[in-house]
């Protein structure tokens, strides 16, 4: 379980500036629902002074994503665009009295959304470096340019650091070799030598290997407490049942539609449909499920029309 500061909890349970800003003239979209994290930042900018008058956010992600987005909107209000662009992802984390290392990618996403919103306001196009050859992590659609920029901005030195800040390498691990290559080049540029960290899984194998034959056999079932699909579905339903009364008090509800691998499809109904807080509701559900199941899952909203098609 991650240790969150009181400020992170405050911005998660009582987020500031949730929802789209009315009359926004700057919009920044980053992330992807299919990858489990998405953020839209909307700004209202005074065209004569370039001062940010108001800011709002809509996000689909974990509690740290909500807290980081909430913090960012508070930080930028009253600043000029150029002043706001000086805010780093570390500044966002510091504003929240710190984030767990595994959640630093949420602050990076906030900074990217701010850059995208400013570019949108100025009519600029953010360089698209997501060419096929530049894509490093296919699981989370992270390109080489983002990996390099994040390594430089945060002085990262390990694959684990890169995963914490960008999510690259957090899926199938096939991109670890490419990440190590980039780390080798970037560390060399700042006069350092990259040393690959030992893989924790290998240490476990070394310890177990000398054990007598009966011990590993006895340990095998206990070492793999994987839930069956039926058990997973039951746990998911239990979590939704616990959340449902809160939604029903606001005349909303949530329904489990399907579970496909790590994808959990749900349908929001009643007042939850089209609610500005819907993305936050989904993010909260996803966080609860991850904690309950002990594995990463993506909560994906299904519209009424899509649900009807699934039933046919």
From Swiss-Prot:
UniProt-reported outcome of changing residue 37 to A: Increases stability of iron-bound protein
Keyword presence, Cell cycle: no
Gene deletion effect: No longer grows diazotrophically (without an external source of N).
Cofactor: Fe cation; [2Fe-2S] cluster
Keyword Ligase on entry: no
Example GO molecular function: 2 iron, 2 sulfur cluster binding
Gene3D superfamilies in UniProt: 3.90.1010.10, BFD-like [2Fe-2S]-binding domain (1.10.10.1100), Fe-S cluster assembly (FSCA) (3.30.300.130)
Binding site for [2Fe-2S] cluster: 137, 139, 172, 175
Cofactor note as given: Binds 1 Fe cation per subunit in a rubredoxin-type site. Binds 1 [2Fe-2S] cluster per subunit.
Effect ascribed to mutating residue 62 to A: Slow diazotrophic growth, normal [2Fe-2S] EPR signal
Pfam families attached to this UniProt entry: Fer2_BFD (PF04324), NifU (PF01106), NifU_N (PF01592)
Residues binding Fe cation: 35, 62, 106
Keyword tags: 2Fe-2S, Iron, Iron-sulfur, Metal-binding, Nitrogen fixation
GO BP term, pick one: iron-sulfur cluster assembly
Consequence recorded when altering residue 139 to A: Slow diazotrophic growth, loss of [2Fe-2S] EPR signal
Subunit structure, interactors included: Homodimer.
NCBIfam families: NifU_proper
Entry's family note: Belongs to the NifU family.
Function (record text): Involved in the formation or repair of [Fe-S] clusters present in iron-sulfur proteins.
UniProt name for this protein: Nitrogen fixation protein NifU
């Amino acid at each position: 379980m991650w240790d969150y500061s009181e400020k992170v909890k405050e911005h998660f349970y009582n987020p500031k500036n949730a929802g789209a800003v009315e009359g926004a003239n700057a919009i920044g979209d980053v992330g992807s629902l299919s990858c489990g994290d998405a953020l839209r930042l909307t700004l209202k900018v005074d065209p004569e002074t370039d001062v940010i008058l108001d800011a709002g956010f809509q996000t689909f992600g974990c509690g740290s994503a909500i807290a980081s987005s909430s913090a960012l909107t508070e930080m930028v209000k009253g600043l000029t665009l150029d002043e706001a662009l000086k805010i780093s992802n570390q500044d966002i984390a510091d504003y929240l009295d710190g984030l767990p290392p595994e959640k630093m990618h949420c602050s990076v996403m906030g900074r990217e959304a701010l850059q995208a919103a400013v570019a949108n306001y100025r009519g600029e196009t953010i360089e698209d470096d997501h060419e096929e050859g530049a894509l490093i992590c296919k699981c989370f659609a992270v390109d080489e340019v983002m990996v390099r920029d994040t390594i430089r901005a945060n002085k990262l030195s390990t694959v684990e650091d890169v995963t914490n800040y960008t999510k690259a390498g957090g899926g199938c691990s096939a991109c670890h070799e490419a990440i190590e290559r980039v780390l080798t080049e970037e560390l060399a540029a700042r006069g350092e030598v990259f040393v690959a960290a030992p893989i924790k899984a290998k240490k476990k194998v070394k310890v177990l290997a000398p054990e007598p034959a009966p011990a590993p056999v006895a340990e095998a079932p206990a070492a793999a407490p994987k839930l069956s699909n039926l058990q997973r579905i039951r746990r998911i339903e239990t979590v939704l049942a616990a959340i449902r009364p809160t939604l029903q008090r606001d005349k909303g509800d949530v329904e489990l539609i399907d579970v496909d691998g790590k994808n959990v499809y749900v349908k929001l109904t009643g007042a939850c449909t089209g609610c500005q807080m819907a993305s936050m509701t989904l993010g909260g559900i996803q966080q609860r499920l991850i904690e309950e199941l002990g594995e990463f899952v993506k909560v994906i909203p299904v519209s009424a029309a899509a649900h009807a098609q699934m039933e046919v």
